[in-house]
Structures are given as C-alpha cells and as structure tokens.
Amino acid sequence: HHSIGFLNKLRILSARYCSKLTIFPPLNLTSLERLELSNCLSLENFPEILGEMKNLLMLALDNLPLKELPVSFQNLVGLQSLYLDNCGIGWFPSSIIGMPKLSLLNATSCKGWQWVKSEEGEEKVDSIVRSNVYDFSANRCNLYDDFFSTSFSQLDHMETLCLRNNNFTFLPECIKEFQFLRRLDVSGCLHLQEIRGVPPNLVDFRAIECISLSSSSSSMLLNQ
C-alpha cells in the first residue's frame, strides 16, 4: 500500500522473499533504520526517496533484478551498510561511493555491473569527494582494467578490499597510497599479470590461483 512509505515511526521494514512484489512506493520514512528488500525477484525499480533519511543505517538489496539506482538514492545520507550481492544493477553512479557515512559496500556477483560510469560533470566532483568506505567487496563482478581508471582512488580509506574472480590485468600503482588497507584479496583473478604497488600496512594479501601473474610481481610479493 502506498501509505507504507510515510509511516514515520517505522524503524525496521523487511519485505524479503516477496517474489510477486513489482512496485515499491516512494519512501519518506524519517525513523527507518533498516530496510530489507532482498530476494524480491520481480522488483526492478528501487523506490524514490522523497527527502533526506538520516536514520537508515542498513540497506539490503541482494538478489534483485534492479537496473539502476535513482538519483534520489543519495538522500539516504545516514546509510552505513549497503548489500548488493547478485543484484542486476548495470550502472552504478560513482557519487554513491562518496556518501558521507557509507562504510560497508558488498556487491559480490553483480556480473552485469558497469563500474562507476560517470554522469556528465561528475568526474570533476569525484576528484575532490573522498569515500569513507572501509570494507568493500566486488567479487565476481566482471571487472576489467577500467575499474581502476575513474573513482578507485576515492576508496583510499579502505581497510578490507575483496576483488576475487574478476578480469582486470593489473593492480594500479596508486594502491600504494592506501595506507589504511590491511586485507586485500584478488584470488581467482586469472588474467592478473602485474602488481604495480603494495599498500604499506598490508597484513593479509591473497592472490591464490592468479595463474597469469608475472615472475617479477610474484617475486615482489615474496619479498614483502
């Protein structure tokens, strides 16, 4: 019912496994802290956010056939944890990476994802806005080398980065500047050939089954 989007005292809203849900009403739930829409297999559009929702901390959109996220998604200014596992999103605006409180982003198995396709004029903003994401997973997302070309440097506050089973051929030199990064996992990246830099405070680096890794990169890792 459309009134659900205006229940101002609602703190938790879970509609998981509502397989016949096709439309979700616009939201202006100022008290909402947790929204779960995972496994709503017929929901192709994320609802419009009509105003700032400062209290929403966690959003689960796993296993949804979403095509994109609306511009109003940025009204979720308090969002801390975003789960997009196996989500159908084909376009992910890079401005979301810079949402002020977002700290955990899990996007495993978003295989059709075109990473950070910038909106017109957005790239200039990206060079200034920093990300607070410290735990980022994009395993099995079909990521290629262009993943590192646009907004990757925004993520320099990360502590954990998981990029297993992707298609890029190198790790960029700029990753040397990621001084907070402790755990990095690129296992199963069969095309990875070159590691151009290693974060200075890394304590756990996994590159299992990276069968194309050059001998010089392998030696560099062994000497760390």
Language-model regions: role of each:
Residues 1-4, 9-50, 55-73, 78-177, ...:
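Leucine-rich repeat
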